């Protein structure tokens, strides 16, 4: 009998002939996620991944916590690996059940069996019936409740047999790095961290770009964005955060452009800078936290004018979500409490009181022609600070 970790994945199973590529990527990401906990053997078999510690006193709790944040994993379980012999299964199941009773005080149970090894002489229902009866005879304080048991004893009969009682849900999605790279425009608000998490869930690596308007925004605002990046890195393992000095550009726009156009012209400048960084880092798309109609710069007309300034595709994972839905995800992934800290970002300074909601591209381009934008953008890119944020 040996304690190991069972990893389940879902969407990867639909990938046909390319499935091994995604499985190998997931196994690589798993190895990176838990490498500091000690040496392990990672294997795959029959749509499962098994992690077998090679050292004593392995920290299973920490490993399970880390694995639950690895994109591509549906769920994980600490399991006992035993021989696929029914006598062995019965004896070890009783040991596990008695241990659970001592720790948790359970009174009722049921057995669920999956038989992947078709050479095993009993089918799944028969295994469950006979094993359940054996447990009842040897653990008289337990009773069966098939509808609402205190715990379920899971049995998977494969080349080896795996018994367990705990299933820990993970984040699902696709393995990080299996779908290229994108640049996330990361503010200090609620929306953009959620957008970054959602695009990363689809297997996309992130380069984050934050626009910093010192002294109009404080050092604490910068620290807040770094903290948000750290939270995202617990899922993404590593994120490069590009902190772009944006004050001169905002001052230029504020001085020379119609007040109602400030926001849309500022957004277009951000997109241009983000695209330059994307081209430098090999990213293939831009990602924002915009949602249709949420604010003036996020009407369909405004989004069309914003998109027109770049050639890369712009992904908006939150496009059809309302604020409550976004907040729910922010709370789930751990960014919400940091996002609501009351520190200004560049989007909250030089704000138009009555921003245009139906901008015309030709008029915006005419206003931009009054600006020394090329020089200011190049200067901002040259003076960008890059921080590498890791999950460790």
UniProtKB/Swiss-Prot annotation:
Sorted UniProt keywords: ATP-binding, Cytoplasm, Nucleotide-binding, RNA-binding, Thiamine biosynthesis, Transferase, tRNA-binding
Pathway, per record: Cofactor biosynthesis; thiamine diphosphate biosynthesis
Xref: InterPro entries: Rossmann-like_a/b/a_fold (IPR014729), ThiI_AANH (IPR020536), ThiI_fer (IPR054173), ThiI_N (IPR049961), THUMP_dom (IPR004114), THUMP_ThiI (IPR049962), tRNA_STrfase (IPR003720), tRNA_sulfurtransferase_ThiI (IPR050102)
Binding residues annotated for ATP, in chain numbering: 185-186, 210-211, 267, 289, 298
Entry's localization field: Cytoplasm
GO biological process: thiamine biosynthetic process; thiamine diphosphate biosynthetic process; thiazole biosynthetic process; tRNA 4-thiouridine biosynthesis
Top enzyme category: transferase
Statement: the UniProt record of this protein carries the keyword ATP-binding: yes
Molecular function terms, GO-annotated: ATP binding; CCA tRNA nucleotidyltransferase activity; tRNA binding; tRNA-uracil-4 sulfurtransferase activity
Catalyzed reactions: [ThiI sulfur-carrier protein]-S-sulfanyl-L-cysteine + a uridine in tRNA + 2 reduced [2Fe-2S]-[ferredoxin] + ATP + H(+) = [ThiI sulfur-carrier protein]-L-cysteine + a 4-thiouridine in tRNA + 2 oxidized [2Fe-2S]-[ferredoxin] + AMP + diphosphate; [ThiS sulfur-carrier protein]-C-terminal Gly-Gly-AMP + S-sulfanyl-L-cysteinyl-[cysteine desulfurase] + AH2 = [ThiS sulfur-carrier protein]-C-terminal-Gly-aminoethanethioate + L-cysteinyl-[cysteine desulfurase] + A + AMP + 2 H(+)
PANTHER family documented for this protein: TRNA SULFURTRANSFERASE
Name of the protein in its database record: Probable tRNA sulfurtransferase
The organism's taxonomic lineage, starting at the top: Bacteria, Bacillati, Bacillota, Clostridia, Eubacteriales
This protein's encoding gene: thiI
